[in-house]
Amino acid sequence: MSLRIWIAAGTTEGRLLAEDLADENVELAVTVATEYGASLIIDKPNVSVLDKRLNDRGMAEFIDQFKPDLAIDATHPYAAMVTETMRRVCEKKGVVYKRLLRPPTDEE
């Protein structure tokens, strides 16, 4: 059985992580906030993409359906509300949560 990984992507790093992991023996679910973001995610049989903003309830339902072993938060550095919600929901659901964080740039 392959590892099931949820990537909440909102940065280039999230997209690149999905591309790297797509070649491994894993099942990926990538969530993004927009249709444009979804269009940037690699198209492979082991990668599913959901373009929808998720609140607490939406994240909990997503976890119940996908059943990830690991959740990686690769959202934008300024998306503090999304990060806190994801961390809290993962803790409640018993899903390992990791934050992939790049420093914000002056242009952002």
Regions found by a protein language model. Give the residues of each.
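N-terminal beta-loop-helix "entrance" segment that forms/cooperates
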Residues: 29-53, 108
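Fold-independent oxyanion-binding glycine-rich loops
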Residues: 8-11, 32-34, 52, 74-75, ...
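N-terminal glycine-rich FAD/FM-binding segment characteristic of electron-transfer flavoproteins
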Residues: 12, 16, 20-21, 39, ...
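Structural motif corresponding to alpha-helix initiation and N-cap regions
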Residues: 56-57
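Glycine/small-residue-rich loop that forms an oxyanion/phosphate-binding "nest" at active or ligand-binding sites
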Residues: 60-108
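Short, glycine/charged-enriched secondary-structure capping and boundary segments
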Residues: 20-23, 43-46, 85-88
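Short, compositionally biased "basic patch" segments
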Residues: 23-39, 88-103
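A short, flexible N-terminal coil/short beta segment enriched in small residues
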Residues: 1-28, 79-83
